[in-house]
Amino acid sequence: MTTRRQFLKTGAAAATGIVFCGCGLRHGAHAEPPVRQKLPILIGGKRVKTIDVHAHCQFREAGTLLGASAAASLVDGRSFNEVAAVAFVEIDKRLAAMDEQGIDMEVLSINPFWYGIERDLAGQIVKLQNEKLAELCAAKPDRFAAFASLTLQAPDLAVQELETAVRKQGLKGAAIGGTVNGEAFSDPKFHPVWAKAEELDVPLFIHPTGIPELSKKLAGNGFLTNAIGYPLETTIALSHLIFEGTFDRFPKLKVIAAHGGGYLPSYADRLDHACLASPKSCNPNILLKKTPSDYLKQIYFDSVIFTPEAIRHLVAQVGVGQVVLGSDYPYPWQLQPLDHIFASASLSDDHKTDILGRTAARLLNFTA
């Protein structure tokens, strides 16, 4: 199986079109536009502030807290050491990369590797990470904002962490996985967390971490646990939030979905027909207030979808006001995260400005 470490090693090679994954595919086979956008970004001669809502980071101190556990497999069959190494915060290196990619501001997040850890240790890790994120944002407020980490396996603790992160540390919401140890976010145990996010008027950034039950099916060449599994995990998470009535219960809850929301935007119309096709599979006690596809207006979708055509399709499905810029930095999925947006002939300059930063600025309550 291709590991993330092996995949990451291809980043520089991929930029020049070298074969990766042993698949015989080339980065150039689905080439990004040749124009490379760098700071400052101008649209119609006007300076535009770009805000990247999908930017990973890690702190070495979290590994210290983990101790020997850092070598154990914690996320999607990968250890903390393997996942974290490429994302350790090196400010000068990160700022230089942001300048090259045309990113004014990153909204930093840490993919949750602690859901399977006992409450006290997980709480220590989350506390440390939120403190470090707040320090980094305070040091470079014009370049960094952040989503808090939450001990979501202990919802009562997560509520306290979110309150502290937003009200005292200035963080802009929270980053969560696609499931918590196999439990869907629609489970009532998580309702207090969603209620707190709604009260604080901050978004939750859903980023998948891997579905253990699919690991065997997706093993082998091609990094399928991520390439296919991650979008699927997001699709499942969002679908449960819709069909179990969570969005009805929390109508002001704001969710940002990584990787363009997985497969949901393309299959939302199929969801609209699901209960018509199989009425017995739908709970008569859960009466949704809207058709399933209408809930896409409560979800924001990042732009980590690679091509101008994919952007056109996403905007057509969910509306331009629901799409925000993402890069997946430092992982080399999309080496030039602005190019496919600029190359999209279907987008007006005003729409591009929205996607690049204006929508995120409103969502996160700061000025673009």
Predicted regions and their residues:
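Residue-level preference for long, well-ordered alpha-helices that form the structural scaffold
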Residues: 83, 87, 122-129, 154, ...
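Divalent metal-dependent hydrolysis catalytic cores, especially in the metallo-beta-lactamase
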Residues: 77-87, 93-118, 143-151, 172-176
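Short glycine-enriched loops at secondary-structure junctions
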Residues: 152, 208-214, 329-331
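Alpha-helical scaffold segments that form or flank carboxylate-/histidine-based iron centers
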Residues: 51, 150-153, 157, 256
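Short aromatic-enriched loop/helix-cap "lid" or pocket-rim segments at secondary-structure transitions
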Residues: 62-66, 121, 216-219, 267-271, ...
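Mid-to-C-terminal alpha-helical segments outside catalytic/metal-binding sites
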Residues: 2-28, 33-49, 53, 59-105, ...
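Catalytic pocket-lining loop regions of alpha/beta-barrel enzymes
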Residues: 33-41, 137, 166-324
